[in-house]
UniProtKB/Swiss-Prot annotation:
The gene coding this protein: mtlA
Family matches, as Pfam families: PTS_EIIC, PTS_IIB
Source organism of this protein record: Streptococcus pneumoniae (strain ATCC BAA-255 / R6)
Record's comment describing the protein's domains: The EIIC type-2 domain forms the PTS system translocation channel and contains the specific substrate-binding site.
Location(s) in or outside the cell: Cell membrane
GO cellular component: plasma membrane
NCBIfam families assigned to the protein according to its UniProt record, in alphabetical order: mtlA (TIGR00851), PRK15083.1 (NF011663)
Protein name: PTS system mannitol-specific EIICB component
Length: 589
């Protein structure tokens, strides 16, 4: 079983290393796409002088950035410099944009100078360090430049041409939609960025240089399949999965954070069929209508997709139609699956944990049930949220915990980054999703590691804050995590509630989502009680026993002090808690 785990981790590392050379530089790709869309001959604002910048950016800037980043990943600044020099050799030794060559020469340059330093660094006599370091980087880079110019560049150019011809043949044979049979499951299994930015982006940029647009940018970024699945949960789902799907739809479709719908698919693995069918139908529509984008859409938001579409009304409508078809097809299939489902489990959070545990165990992984050390302000100096790409859901998770840490009066930095960029530093608390914890531990064994089911709604955040403030230690077993506060919702006289208020501190986002979740549940149960949000400083207006205030464990004391006469429902998450369904079942208004 250990061999299977290590193989899986190695595959993830390979895919991640490719995407991590591209993702930090997506801004440059977007800048090039905007420049192309505006100033080339058929752009929105044709300009011959500015159009001359398009070619050099494509040929030199973008590959050198990739090579620089690849070298930096291996050996810091010295690796980045040598990787850039080597990449120039590949660029000038070829007649095609050298993205794949940059992905080879960048890490190779970093690895070569790293091995040189390991062998000779300790042998340098005092006073000669700068001389040796500068000349070694220059000479190693020079040697790799010659190698890339005469060998790597031509070989990669031939391979790139072959791959491009293969993609063109697949497109001409109308077989491109079949790629979604692999793409959609891979997205849910943390390979979405590897596919999109490690494979499709380099190939797509070359297509844009030739044809002005590329359908490859739409294969993984299409939000249609996820939108259809979330909509099916909103109509045919049960419990907290149903009520939380509305907020998830907004984040997925407009925010472009596709990771938010992954747990909904993991809850019922048969929904992979809905995702694949939606992806296939969407790509088929894109291909039928000759749709494409001028640059990568990152994140996969409908706003970013529309912004990078070619000039004209029809190109935008063609893309929207492809997204719509994908959403409708995935919705219909997911609706059939959910409607036929007879299970009684209706807690998204519980199903998430069960699915993640079963998934990890089936792959030979041990589910992380405890932290590696005591969490306190003495043992933790910073908190890092780590994920495959270091963006998206980990950034949102970091934002949520950062807000909780500030409210607790702690001065701890909370940031997010890619697992591949983690350093082995002590006194660091690293939060990862269970699927990625083995890789994080491998990169940073000295850190304290905490696994969560879902970055966007985890009860472990309140546990971490409580442990850091000395209120209580982190629960050793995940199953022991409390799902509500000391105030028991069973004791609340629910039949004498005239209004429900969701309280928030500085950030209103999760409170708004929680408010919409409760409203959706009340509508389904025909409960006519108004639900609103309020800042803690405004709770004095709701200080009455016929008002129920909903808040989280971390804000409980502050909220009860602001409105001591109100009734309270304390939950672990304002969005995914099962307490809302239990509350509605006991209300008869």
């Amino acid at each position: 079983m250990e061999e299977k785990v290590s193989l899986k981790v190695r595959v993830q590392k390979l895919g991640t290393s490719l995407s991590n050379m591209v993702m930090p530089n997506i801004g440059a790709f977007i800048a090039w796409g905007v420049l192309t869309a505006l100033f080339i001959a058929d752009g929105y604002l044709p300009n011959e002088q500015l159009a001359t910048v398009v070619g050099p950016m494509l040929t030199y800037l973008l590959p050198i950035l990739i090579g620089y980043t690849g070298g930096y990943m291996i050996h810091g600044q010295r690796g980045a410099v040598v990787g850039s020099i080597a990449t120039v050799g590949a660029i000038t030794g070829s007649s095609v944009p050298m993205f794949i060559g940059a992905m080879v020469m960048g890490p190779l340059g970093g690895w070569t100078i790293k091995k040189f330093d390991e062998k000779f660094q300790e042998k340098i006599r005092p006073g000669f360090e700068m001389l040796v370091n500068n000349f070694s980087a220059g000479l190693v880079g020079f040697a790799l430049l010659l190698l890339a110019f005469y060998a790597i560049g031509p070989v990669v150019s031939t391979l790139t041409g072959a791959v491009g011809n293969g993609v063109e043949a697949i497109v001409n044979a109308r077989l491109l939609p079949m790629a979604n049979i692999i793409i959609e499951p891979a997205k849910v299994l943390f390979l979405n960025n590897a596919l999109n930015h490690g494979i499709f982006t380099p190939l797509g940029v070359e297509q844009v240089a030739q044809a002005g647009k590329s359908i490859l940018f739409l294969l993984e970024a299409n939000p249609g399949p996820g939108l259809g699945i979330l909509l099916a949960y909103a109509v045919f789902g049960k419990g907290s999965a149903k009520s939380s799907s509305w907020g998830a739809m907004v984040i997925h479709f407009f925010g472009g954070i596709h990771e938010i719908y992954f747990p909904y698919v993991m809850m019922k693995p048969t929904l992979f069929l809905a995702a694949m069918a939606g992806g296939i139908s969407g790509t088929f529509t894109f291909q039928l209508l000759d749709a494409g984008l001028k640059s990568p859409a990152s994140p996969g938001s409908i706003i970013a997709i529309m912004a990078t579409a070619p000039k004209g009304v029809w190109p935008h409508l063609n893309i929207l139609l492809g997204v719509l078809v994908a959403a409708v097809v995935s919705f219909l299939i997911a609706a059939l699956i959910l409607h036929a489902d007879k299970s009684t489990e209706d807690s998204l959070e519980a199903a998430q944990a069960a699915t993640q545990a079963a998934k990890a165990q089936s792959k030979g992984q041990l589910v992380s049930t405890s932290v590696d050390a005591v969490v306190s302000t003495d043992s933790v100096e910073k908190i890092i949220f780590a994920c495959d790409a270091g963006m998206g859901s980990s950034a949102m998770g970091a934002s949520i915990l950062r807000d909780k840490v500030k409210k607790a009066g702690l001065e701890l930095p909370v940031s997010n980054q890619a697992i591949s960029n983690l350093l082995d530093t002590p006194k660091t608390l690293i939060v990862t999703q269970e699927e990625l914890t083995p890789r994080a531990k491998d990169k940073s064994p000295s850190a304290i590691h905490v696994s969560v089911d879902n970055f966007l709604a985890s009860p472990r955040y309140d546990e971490i804050v409580a442990s850091l403030t000395g209120a209580s230690p982190i629960a050793e077993i995940e199953g022991d995590i409390p799902t509500s506060a000391p105030v028991d919702s069973q004791e609340i006289d629910l039949n004498h509630i005239d209004a429900v208020v969701v309280a928030y501190g500085k950030a209103q986002g999760t409170a708004t989502m929680g408010c919409e979740t409760i409203r959706a549940i009340f509508r389904n149960k025909n409960i006519r009680i108004p639900v609103s949000t309020a800042k803690i400083s405004e709770l004095g207006e709701f200080n009455s026993k016929n008002i129920m205030i909903v808040t989280t464990i971390s804000l409980q004391a502050e909220v009860q002090q602001a409105a001591p006469n109100s009734q309270f429902l304390i939950v672990d998450s304002l969005v995914t808690t099962p307490e809302y369904d239990k509350m509605a079942a006991r209300m008869y208004k």
